[in-house]
Amino acid sequence: MLTARALVNKFNLQLVAGEEGLDRPIHNTDISRPGLEMAGYFSHYASDRIQLLGTTELSFYNLLPDEERHGRLRKLCRPDTPAIIVTRDIEPPEELVVAAKELGTPLLTSKDATTSLMSRLTTYLEHELAKTTSLHGVLVDVYGVGVLITGDSGIGKSETALELVKRGHRLVADDNVEIREITKDELIGKPPKLIEHLLEIRGLGIINVMTLFGAGSILTEKKIGLNINLENWDKNKLYDRVGLNEETLRILDTEITKKTIPVRPGRNVAVIIEVAAMNYRLNIMGINTAEEFNERLNAEILRKNEHKEENES
């Protein structure tokens, strides 16, 4: 559970009042700058957000008549308000200090500029409050692409990851991948602390990739872009031989590109995954070899049909 106390430590904030409220939970990633509330409009006050007060809000507050000041700031301090932060090292108004003490709302100060702190807070909250899940698989950084290798147990995921590491790529997680959906279409994968840097190879046991191959062979987390699903070769199944069939894997609310690779003796799966990662990067750049081949094929068929019609006439 994320609380205001964690923000104090993370962003070097100073506590002014409301210490008893430091353990209030934070559930909302949005941050408010209560300008309309300073003007007295509280009909849609987002009290469950962190409230940020900067030069603009406090300069307007100083223009208010004395009889309105205390009540205005008191309304900011709600039971579900995680914290009120005053930026730019501005001294909080005495009325706000009193209200925070009485109502137990954490009142904090920061030396940072308002916009800068708001940006950093938003990034931190999105990361910490992101939806999470875990998947059985291996996550490897291949040519800068986060490749999630999935498949049945014993199919060879870890062995493939080992081969990729030997070829200069970087291991992120083996066996269990913890995934956070930071924003829409952005999945970040990382290993559980217990098995960080470790790889399990059947018949060999558990190896420490960082110890064997060096610090350059591992990553602590990586954005997931491509899913490679390994399966035993089925001679009765028609596999995509051109690359026009687009599969996707849905993780939380995000869909990523999926490629199914049939496994059988003689196929170098690690090399295939390298090529898949490079091809994925080309697709992002707008270069699709399968579509280009299909266009050339259709053009050639059309040309031959026209030539045939001319000969018949």
UniProtKB/Swiss-Prot annotation:
EC number: 2.7.11.-, 2.7.4.-
Keywords tagged on the record: ATP-binding, Carbohydrate metabolism, Kinase, Magnesium, Metal-binding, Multifunctional enzyme, Nucleotide-binding, Serine/threonine-protein kinase, Transferase
Domain of life: Bacteria
Recorded catalytic activity of this chain's protein: [HPr protein]-L-serine + ATP = [HPr protein]-O-phospho-L-serine + ADP + H(+); [HPr protein]-O-phospho-L-serine + phosphate + H(+) = [HPr protein]-L-serine + diphosphate
GO molecular function: ATP binding; magnesium ion binding; phosphorelay sensor kinase activity; protein serine/threonine kinase activity; protein serine/threonine/tyrosine kinase activity
Family under the similarity heading: Belongs to the HPrK/P family.
Protein name in UniProt: HPr kinase/phosphorylase
Organism annotation: Staphylococcus carnosus (strain TM300)
